[in-house]
């Protein structure tokens, strides 16, 4: 693989390349009255150089010795591979460059050598032309030309006093297109139940019903594993196994095989422009790759299956479990105490070099003590894909009202008008408003904006006046509504603040179709 020195490259606009991140303070939205959202207990991360150095340093910490059982590891890989092949087959074909670009998120960074802030949509022609030129190089047995990733950060909400900005590897856009040519072929096939792509919390309770009752309540225990620094600690051996499984799904030509080898090499040995120097990692998963989620999912499946094979009593049921990245919802045939679960199952992850956060890992059995539930208020639950699944058959979403206040008042990007604030609040009510107290809290803030519905529609749909702002409205609106929440409502329905029962029915089903969760036996 040919590495291109960043200092020898001029940006397409002829200006020098910027290094690092310029940290800026996140201010409260000026359109939300302070009286409605009082003193906030949360703030957003600040991507200072010191904190970003800590994040990147996790990819280079000394590795402790780990000795997996090779026989069990290979068996786990074969089991996971069999599950993927049984659903996708072995004859997928790589898609074209243009089709790949159509399925990429258009508002994300185009990476180097484009200027900071340039989106993939703005750089689409040059990106696709460069991607095609790389296919020509590989077909002539030349090395893939690569650029380092651009440094980025995600400023998430934290309790005051904490600061842990999330490191983003902003991939060069042309490499994202080439990677996505493989991924698009996979996403054309409806996902199996064991991949989180099949889970949609706004499907009338079907996903919840499948997770809890898809096996007619025959599970004995369920768990959710929380990893510490999962992306930074994944070892190269596991990534090789994941790419092996990914490759087995395709019928590849010689050129496509070579290209996948070089993409894997870049995925493992990823360079990043880190302020005034270029750093190259040799382990871990980079966050900006098109392969990030699917490789992380396969690695997670392999690790969980390996721990199951190495434990004495935990038989993992893959068809009724679910994974997405480092998130997991595990279904077991055995019910033992929490201490036994930690000793017999969680300890096995250390053999693969993965760190499990014991305190944040949730485990519960179907044998729930009736006395503790009724008189002590014990509510066993697991968390999956940002939601809290109560085993007593109640789906909860956002109990931390202080954090909800911060989400309303502290936008990650500055609100350009009250109408953009309204769009964010509509997104929040669809994401968290299935409980009435939370719904009313968001509605109260929304009404304080005093928006005119017809002007709201005009601002979002019109390109005629202030096109740079209307474009921003559209990008924020459609990315949150269409991509993240998977809503299939008409756009004019989405622009109005929804009624409570419309939101509730999306999560739990209508009163005629609502799942009768209480009819299931929940006590052992």
Curated annotation (Swiss-Prot):
Function: RNA-dependent RNA polymerase which replicates the viral genome.
One of the record's GO molecular function terms: nucleotide binding
CDD domains assigned: RNA_dep_RNAP
Domain RdRp catalytic, chain residue ranges per copy: 220-340
Highest taxon of source: Viruses
InterPro entries, alphabetized: DNA/RNA_pol_sf (IPR043502), Rev_trsase/Diguanyl_cyclase (IPR043128), RNA-dir_pol_C (IPR001205), RNA-dir_pol_PSvirus (IPR007094)
Stated name of the protein: RNA-directed RNA polymerase
GO biological-process terms attached to the record: DNA-templated transcription; viral RNA genome replication
Family annotation (PROSITE patterns): RDRP_SSRNA_POS (PS50507)
Keyword vocabulary terms for this entry: Nucleotide-binding, Nucleotidyltransferase, RNA-directed RNA polymerase, Transferase, Viral RNA replication
Species the sequence originates in: Cryptosporidium parvum virus 1 (strain KSU-1)
Reactions accelerated catalytically: RNA(n) + a ribonucleoside 5'-triphosphate = RNA(n+1) + diphosphate
EC number in record: 2.7.7.48
Top EC class, one word: transferase
